[in-house]
Amino acid sequence: EILKEKGKYSTIRKIFAPIWIKGPIEKFVDGKTVIVGDAAGQAKPTTAGGIFTSGMGGVFAGQAISKFLKTNEISHLQEYQKRWTERFGKEFDKQLLARKILERLDNQTINKLFESITPEITNEISEKDDFDFHTSSIIKLLGIKGSLKTAQTLISGEFKKILG
């Protein structure tokens, strides 16, 4: 009925909401309530993307719910958060740290960081690294020499804030 009235490709209603990027919430499971995806803080802190991390959250939650329904043992629901945290917890911790650092930088400092990236490094990361695990790419991107140059850039940016 609605589609006939509105037309085949009409927008019925648009909904907008912010995406939580401060990391996973404390409890994915509360009693028999299971929280997944953006609501559970499974969007990546660096990019706010979360198709893979939230999707895997859905898979882990579904498996835990299935076990719970077969056994009626509520402890099976807790396996969901345990599995998700084992898979993504350390990466999210690193991404949260990266985000905290990057949020403090001014545009000029960020531009200098990007200018230090060589085409060779970009190609290596594009060919070999995992899009959903950014911190390994960042470490590879900077390398030892890059880390020194990056530290100088970050420090000079912070000094400018203090002095100016």
Language-model features: where?
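FAD/FMN-dependent oxidoreductases across multiple families
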Residues: 1-61, 65-70
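C-terminal helical "tail/cap" subdomain of flavin- and related membrane-associated enzymes
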Residues: 66-164
